[in-house]
Each structure stands twice: as C-alpha cells, then as structure tokens.
Amino acid sequence: MQNYFQLLGLQQDYNIDLKILEKQYFAMQVKYHPDKAKTLQEKEQNLIIAAELNKAYSTLKDALKRAEYMLLLQNINLNDQKARTLLSSLELSIFWDEMEIIENTTICSDLEKIKAKYELMEKHEIDSLKQAFEEQNLSDATIKTSKLKYIGTLLNKLQKKIKSCK
C-alpha cells in the first residue's frame, strides 16, 4: 500500500495545507465510496481503501500524528524504548512537576492560564518541527516530536480538569 501522502495525492512534507488535505480526502472518499462499486469484489476493495483513507486523513491532519508518521517512514519509532528516553531528566522532571501542579490546581481560571501557556508551547514546537523536517534534521524532529507528545499529554489533562470544574 502507498504511504499516506501518496494515497491522498500530497507531497510528503510536514508543512501541509490542511485545506488541501481535506479536499483531497473528500475527493478520494467520493471516488472510492463502497456504494459506487458495481461488483461485490469492487465494493470490498473500496471498503478497504476507504478505511485506509480514513486512517491517512486522521493521521495527517493531526500535527503530532503527522510527525510520528513521518518519522516512522524514516524507520524511527517513538514507541521504542530508546526513543522514549530522548528528553533530558530535567525536561522530564519539569513535565512531572507540571502534571502535579495541574492535579493540585482547583481554580478554573488558573487552569485556563496554564492551558494557554501550553497551547503557545505546542504552537512553538509545531513551528520548530516544520523547520526540522524542512531541514531533514531527523534527530531534532524526533526530540521535538517527543516534546510535542508530552505537551499534548499536559493539554489533555488540562482539558479534562477544566471540563470537570465547569
């Protein structure tokens, strides 16, 4: 099977235009819709392609998943034990301290401020990732993807906490 970029007719680039991605995705969904098949075999084939298109779209539209996928295309798997130890002990310590702060914060406005800080950090990391992939600096891209993953974890925790206090 083609890689997700090829499947959706896109250039393999981290910095993709999300509107073009969406346009390509919907065009391909229409083209391979199972109801358009004339035979049972064609319908089954279209179901497989449609499922693959769904996976490709959900992966490429998400900045973190797209980065992980692009690294995977270069045989770099962030789920490997080695990749999990990319961040320094200081960075990991800060991450765990922040998790504790979030856990102990009960005032919604304080949680919103923390969330805004991490959304800004997430944007900065994504911009840095664009540059790392553009320069084909896979080492830097791997570290930045790992950081983005931790930031995402903090943001998810914040989201849940904010939702529970409203």
Curated annotation (Swiss-Prot):
One of its GO terms (biological process) is [2Fe-2S] cluster assembly. Residues 3-73 form the J domain. GO terms for molecular function: ATPase activator activity; protein-folding chaperone binding. The keyword Chaperone applies. Keywords: Chaperone. The keyword Lipid metabolism does not apply. InterPro entries: DnaJ_domain, HscB, HscB_C_sf, HscB_oligo_C, J_dom_sf. Co-chaperone involved in the maturation of iron-sulfur cluster-containing proteins. Seems to help targeting proteins to be folded toward HscA. Interacts with HscA and stimulates its ATPase activity. HAMAP family: HscB. Belongs to the HscB family. This is Co-chaperone protein HscB homolog.
